[in-house]
Amino acid sequence: YGSDESLLLKQALECGICQAGVNVYSIGRAGISELSYAVNRFGGEFGILIGANISGHARLISAGGMLPDEKLLDRIGSIADDRDYRSVGLSQTGCVTDFSAVREIYVAELEKILPDRFKGVNVDIRTYDVRKATIADRLFHGRNDIDGERIIFNLSADGTKVSAYSEKTSYVMWEKLVAMYAGVCFEKGLAVALPENFPSNADAAAEDHCGRLYRYENNADIAKDVAVSTHNMFVYDGLYLASAVTSYLSEQGITLQKALCDVPDAYTSSRFVGITMSRENKKKIFSELGCSAEGEITMGKTHAVIRPLRDKKGITVFAESVSCEQAAAFCEDITSRIKGIFK
């Protein structure tokens, strides 16, 4: 995925898989977005993302960004516990094929949905991933309308989600962006597949547009055929979603606020906390609250994001939920916990 340690772990895993008589297609240093695309586009059974930041770990995914069937996961766990690994003879050993070119094919897929030049849109992508930042610069820098609406997209640490910010909309959570673009797909007559725990505003969008919305839990569900469709990548690929939303705004000549006005409300609440957001304080707050690297917190169907002011002299807490009461309560709880940290 990134480090030399993860590369060594990947090579060791490849040897074990080949010894079991299974072929491996290696895409090299890449993220879950490229891996998911490769599994979808070229009909792979599964994708494995290897990481080794603190300790070695592997993430198993199947087509459409879905989790593998629970029965399969249980079987894998049982084999690992019993150390009952399959091994074949030399003549049946699998082979490793260099499939790194898929990373360039993935970028080309994103370029296909973007116009040569944006009209009325000026996009900036924020991410901690240097590789993602390089791809984003290639996709957006030369296409931006410098006089257009300024929109900042914040990619999640693993690149699967994205939130947005503009002066007129303030922060827009991933869930609302997904619901908005799902509506665009419904207008085009395309079906959409979402995780079963996705907020209900997507169902309301489907009703408004007479769209076909499927829910899935894992790759055993009937929604798999829809989930693996290229247009459904916006559900599990933050960069694809940012590209698709930007393309739609440019094509329609509308602002992000206008595009979101027809999306069913996901109720929001916000609070200000007057605490200096130094690097030490930020680390302490995120650690105590269990935030992601982007300052996001999720509890059931309620989501929140913590953002420092530009001058670092305060924090704004934004929360979104299926009801106004839940959003306000969650926002108030986070605010109280932050204040409690510095008592």
Region locations from a protein language model:
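Short hydrophobic beta-strand segments
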Residues: Y1-D4, G120-V130, L190-E196
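Short, highly selective alpha-helical patches that border small-molecule cofactor pockets
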Residues: S6, K10, E14, A133-A136, ...
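Alpha-helical scaffold segments in soluble metabolic enzymes
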Residues: A12, E34-Y37, R75, I105-I113, ...
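Short, acidic/small-residue loops that bind anionic groups at enzyme active sites
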Residues: S26, S62-D82, Y171-E187, E217
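Phosphate-binding and adjacent anionic-ligand microenvironments
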Residues: S156-T160, Y165-S170, W174-K343
